[in-house]
């Protein structure tokens, strides 16, 4: 059978993270590198695994060693969140002061972004016009048709990026996922407590209106997605099934989509839904891509896609014909749904340049550009018209295989801080300044309607939301308030609001608040420049959750 009405199965034994240790990891390194990178007490790691049920002690070691392990178990049993976040909190991701933008200078994405933000054709100095000057030009009738164009509106909004905490909701366990619906009317949050919470975001509200207990959950809900019609949502976990559930109505109807995997321990780390809602795409820990057809009510494809865990999947655009996938082999692959066959699983191309596993992929929505987040502590921007050569793919595979650290509980090795470009790296741009530790941290393009997609934003293992300028590569905003890693981030499709979901158990909504006037925002006349700044005004507060 393809689907069933599933029953609650509890949390299960689960795993302490999304992925098992990488296959092929552990090649020899120099003694100097090992001394630099070794900063984890192996006994503490073992205690953590024992506490989570991932390993068992069978025999040997002596009573003294067992007593020592038990002491660690007892001392840290009530402090899991501190363990999960402490390495990320100590890590200070290096910021790239001089990003290499040479590949972007002659690529069409530069023109696209400048056109979408009203900067195309302007001299560099004019692109930095202050907001008051733009208003002055509009009043003089110098704007097109007497009003701001959509691009100029996006440029105006860039002056008002979220900078203040407007709302917080707290959970008893880690928040794993949090996304806005396509129309921005609903926000969905998934927590390790097996509960999926839905928030009403209409008319400036952010109010919880429904809580749903997830089914067949092992460890945690790992990914969520809305159906295109906005009436249902899907979620995945350490389970053979992807579940779909209704948003509206009195009761909760959970339908389990059976993927029929070959692995005994199976997890779907990433899911996506086609634009017509018919096909569900999943990336799993067995290195395979799965396609489930909801009309046929069965799994229609199981493609051997990567040499290791598939951590990220995405559709390239609204046609849902081109797919992206990324895994722990550090390769991003591009697939054509019309030519995918189980007996001949060949992608149409591959994108190589990362030095460690890929944690997330987001498409720009135009079937051409995408970004990928990676355990090598970088985000890369790709153009699928520039596939990588065999040399580039081999360089990425070799770099990933030679990694001898585990991002879930070890510090980032110092060699990963180096600004190194692999041979054959076909990426357009590399963004540095955020941390990727503990979990599959997400990154995304900013919305097209409000920002012209001129920004890239990401969660961070240090508890921040990091916003990059897409064209310059520089960090334009850091939102800091969480006490553990931020796993997921979501920007409202039409408003200047960002929601962060963190392992500290908090959901935070960030919005713009005028705190003070800055020099470049003041009119240039001496009379206005000397006028006192008004008293700061707080924006309208949000309603408390029910």
UniProtKB/Swiss-Prot annotation:
WD repeats lie at residues 170-210, 216-258, 263-302, 305-345, 353-392, 435-480, 481-520. GO terms for biological process: exploration behavior; gene expression; memory; proteasome-mediated ubiquitin-dependent protein catabolic process; protein stabilization; protein ubiquitination; respiratory system process; response to oxidative stress. Pathway: Protein modification; protein ubiquitination. Residues 536-546 have a biased composition (Polar residues). May function as a substrate receptor for CUL4-DDB1 E3 ubiquitin-protein ligase complex. Keywords: Phosphoprotein, Repeat, Ubl conjugation pathway, WD repeat. SMART domains: WD40. It comes from Homo sapiens (Human). Residues 1-19 have a biased composition (Low complexity). Pfam families: WD40. GO terms for cellular component: Cul4-RING E3 ubiquitin ligase complex; nucleoplasm. It comes from the Eukaryota. The keyword Repeat applies. Interacts with DDB1 and CUL4A. Residues 1-40, 523-546 are annotated as: Disordered. The modification Phosphoserine is found at residue 75. This is DDB1- and CUL4-associated factor 11.
């Amino acid at each position: 059978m393809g689907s069933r009405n599933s029953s609650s199965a509890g949390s299960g034994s689960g795993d302490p993270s999304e992925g098992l240790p990488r296959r092929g990891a552990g090649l020899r390194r120099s003694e100097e590198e090992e001394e630099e990178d070794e900063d984890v007490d192996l006994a503490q790691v073992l205690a953590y695994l024992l506490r989570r049920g991932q390993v068992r002690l069978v025999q040997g070691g002596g009573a003294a060693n067992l007593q020592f392990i038990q002491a660690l178990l007892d001392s840290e049993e009530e402090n899991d969140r501190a363990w999960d976040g402490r390495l990320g909190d100590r890590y200070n991701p290096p910021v790239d002061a001089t990003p290499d933008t040479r590949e972007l200078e002659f690529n069409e994405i530069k023109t696209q972004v400048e056109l979408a933000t009203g900067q195309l054709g302007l001299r560099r100095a004019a692109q930095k016009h202050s907001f008051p000057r733009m208003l002055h030009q509009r009043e003089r009738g110098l704007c097109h048709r007497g009003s701001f164009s959509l691009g100029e509106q996006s440029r105006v909004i860039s002056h008002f990026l979220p900078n203040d905490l407007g709302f917080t909701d707290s959970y008893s366990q880690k928040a794993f996922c949090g996304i806005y619906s396509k129309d921005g009317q609903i926000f969905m949050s998934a927590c390790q407590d097996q509960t999926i919470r839905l928030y009403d975001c209409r008319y400036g509200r952010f109010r919880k209106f429904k809580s749903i207990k997830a089914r067949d959950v092992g460890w945690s809900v790992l990914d969520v997605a809305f159906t295109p019609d906005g009436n249902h949502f899907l979620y995945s976990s350490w389970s053979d099934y992807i579940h779909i559930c209704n948003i509206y109505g009195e009761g909760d109807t959970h339908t389990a989509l059976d993927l029929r995997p070959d692995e005994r321990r199976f997890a779907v780390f990433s899911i996506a839904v086609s634009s017509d809602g018919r096909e569900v795409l999943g990336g799993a820990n067995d290195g395979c891509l799965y396609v489930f057809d909801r009309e046929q009510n069965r799994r229609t494809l199981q493609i051997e896609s990567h040499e290791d865990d598939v951590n990220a999947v995405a559709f390239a655009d609204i046609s849902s014909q081109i797919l992206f996938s990324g895994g722990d082999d550090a390769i991003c692959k591009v697939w054509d749904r019309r030519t995918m066959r189980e007996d001949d699983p060949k992608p149409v191309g591959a994108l190589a340049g990362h030095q460690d596993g890929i944690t997330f992929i987001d498409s720009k929505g135009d079937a051409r550009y995408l970004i990928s987040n990676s355990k090598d502590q970088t985000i890369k921007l790709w153009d699928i018209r520039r596939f990588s050569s065999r040399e580039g793919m081999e360089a990425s595979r070799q770099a990933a295989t030679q990694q001898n650290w585990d991002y879930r509980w070890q510090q980032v090795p110092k060699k990963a801080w180096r600004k190194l470009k692999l041979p054959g790296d076909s990426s357009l741009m590399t963004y540095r300044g955020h941390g990727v530790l503990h979990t599959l941290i997400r990154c995304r393009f900013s919305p097209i309607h409000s920002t012209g997609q001129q920004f890239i934003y990401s969660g961070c293992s240090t508890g921040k939301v990091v916003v990059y300028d897409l064209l310059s590569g520089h960090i334009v905003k850091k939102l800091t308030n969480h006490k553990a890693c931020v796993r997921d981030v979501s920007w409202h499709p039409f408003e200047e609001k960002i929601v962060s979901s963190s392992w500290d158990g908090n959901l935070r909504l960030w919005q713009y608040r005028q705190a003070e006037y800055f020099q470049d925002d003041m009119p240039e006349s001496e009379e206005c420049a000397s006028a006192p700044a008004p008293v700061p005004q707080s924006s309208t507060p949000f309603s408390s959750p029910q």
